[in-house]
Amino acid sequence: IDKYFSPFISPNQKKICRTREKKDILPENNAGLYLVPQIMTNQAEMFLQTVEYLQQFGYNEVNLNLGCPAATVVSRKKGSGFLTEPKKLESFLKEIYEGTNVKISIKTRIGYESAEEFPILLSIFNQFPINELIVHPRTREDFYQNTPDMQAFSYAMDHSKNVLCYNGDIFSKEDYNHLMAQYPSLSSVMLGRGILQNPAVIASIKGEKLPEKETIQEFVTELCERYQSELYGERPVLFKMKELWHYLIQSFDADEKIAKKIKKAQKISEYEITVKELFSNYDLKI
């Protein structure tokens, strides 16, 4: 992996960065990684203040999130909700690109309700020196359902004045190869859910040794232990681990019964017994 993106920072008038968000971007917590902090706001002043704050940690590249589809986000016209106001978005981009020399990449969807919105959005993006335009070819209304709109992505490839990165539904080496066969000039691909669902996907793409079941078990165990040291109480830890297993379970030749047992676990001890059962009784299918 050449580049990582942090969970988004959502600045407000009271605080630029919450304690949890600060932990995400502290250099000592990201040793050896090229990390790009992600910012989500519709206020140019807040964006620039956050950039200035991040510079003190040595960051010279940030990312603007225009892709998040969560209802609590879009109701505030942030994330993909900002795509509904192209004129305000254009003014916002003008102000932030004039206000800093830090490299700014953008992650966007192709519209809020329809891909028909995308040509206007792309014409706005083309006015600015975007370090990297990461396109997830779904609308906000799609969330993560339906299939990526490759016609819209082809339009981006043909008309974007900025370097493009593709994001969406790369779950296997076959998915990656199919994408690159369609777009041989594409310079980069971003993985999100794909690497959670298939931890071997990058090794597979690069032709490297695939992770063994024991390696994944060690990772899952350590992750749970770290959550327990960082979070208060069992419920938030279980929430985080169940969120991961929603995707990771698909890497195993497991039945619905064991998946439900993980989902229904009410205590960490119960969760750990079930996960141990999974690793003992089911093989990887990646």
Where are these regions (language model features)?
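Flavin-dependent oxidoreductase catalytic cores
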Residues: I1-I286
